[in-house]
């Protein structure tokens, strides 16, 4: 049996789903271990690709203080012993961590049971857990690490199917990540009338916390907008879109890349180690995206960018920047290393 562990946010969970799909193609149904917190249940409770799903009461350690940090560590340690016993009982051959605090019990449980641990780091800057565990991993996968045995990001094949050659801006997507982004929502509200006058269709993923505000805003303006809080069918949304304005979580960066959607990235300013900035900077350095800091966000500059962007060449180059099949390449390494 193979275990996939990790989660908390959509970026981690999208990797888990992509790897699960690749294992399924090899007639393997992994066990999934996540957390009772975050979005893990929303994504995977009852998901048919996994043989079984287990959600443990673990929380992050980094943002805790004092006794809260000790309590969080204690929970992780207890659940690590639970995972160790489960792995031994099930005859687990390998554990694949996709990062996030939800991965801690399973990853430590694997080391305690002397089961090969494989880690995928999604961001340009290693997370603290992944940095701690990297020396003990059988293999460490990262699109930003020159020593990674597989360098392409594990994007689901659905996003490659969402590719089409874009030649002009007909539909603009505001994408704030799985939890939404107030700064991106505010920008959308500011430039929506201008977009409407230009005849540009608007798709807006605003997050649950801002859904009612967004509904009221667009109703007041009487402008047609495809508005939603969150979707599991982002590939279909990307297929409709010509250009995106988005956060720079690694999942979003590489899914937009696979679908060939040119983007303006506005990194979340409080992301650990500023990793969202560096996720997008890798593409910006190749001339494949535009990057604006949130505190320097200017609607007039955004309008100017939208008027000047060379959609056709960037769309084609983005799609060529990432190869499909990375999930299969990763599970091939996992299966070989677990023998």
For each of these PLM feature ranges, what is it?
Residues 4-7, 26-74, 210, 293-295:
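Conserved nucleotide-sugar phosphate-binding/catalytic loop shared by glycosyltransferases and other
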């Amino acid at each position: 049996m193979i275990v996939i562990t990790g989660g908390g946010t959509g970026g981690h969970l999208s990797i888990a789903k992509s790897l699960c799909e690749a294992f399924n193609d090899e007639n393997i149904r992994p066990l999934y271990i996540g957390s009772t917190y975050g979005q893990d249940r929303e994504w995977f409770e009852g998901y048919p690709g996994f043989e079984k799903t287990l959600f443990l009461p673990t929380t992050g350690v980094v943002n805790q203080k004092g006794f809260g940090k000790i309590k969080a560590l204690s929970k992780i340690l207890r659940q690590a012993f639970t995972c160790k016993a489960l792995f031994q009982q099930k005859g687990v051959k390998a554990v694949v961590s996709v990062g996030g605090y939800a991965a801690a019990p399973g990853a430590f449980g694997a080391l305690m049971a002397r089961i090969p641990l494989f880690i995928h780091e999604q961001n340009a800057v290693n997370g603290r857990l992944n940095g701690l565990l990297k020396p003990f991993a059988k293999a460490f996968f990262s699109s930003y690490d020159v020593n990674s045995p597989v360098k392409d990001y594990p994007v689901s094949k659905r996003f490659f199917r969402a590719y089409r050659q874009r030649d002009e801006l007909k539909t603009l997507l505001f994408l704030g990540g799985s939890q939404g982004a107030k700064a991106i929502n505010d920008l959308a509200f500011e430039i929506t009338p201008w977009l409407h006058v230009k005849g540009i269709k608007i798709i807006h993923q605003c997050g649950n916390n801002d859904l009612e505000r967004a509904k009221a805003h667009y109703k007041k303006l009487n402008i047609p907008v495809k508005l939603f809080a969150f979707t599991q069918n982002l590939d279909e949304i990307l297929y409709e879109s010509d250009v995106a304005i988005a956060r720079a979580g690694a999942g979003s960066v590489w899914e937009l890349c696979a679908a060939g959607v040119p983007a303006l990235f506005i990194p979340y300013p409080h992301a650990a180690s500023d990793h969202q900035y560096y996720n997008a900077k890798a593409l910006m350095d190749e001339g494949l995206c535009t990057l604006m800091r949130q505190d320097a966000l200017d609607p007039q500059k955004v309008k100017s960018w939208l008027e000047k962007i060379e959609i056709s060449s960037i769309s084609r180059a983005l799609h060529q920047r990432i190869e499909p099949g990375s999930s299969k390449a990763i599970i091939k390494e996992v299966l070989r290393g677990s023998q």
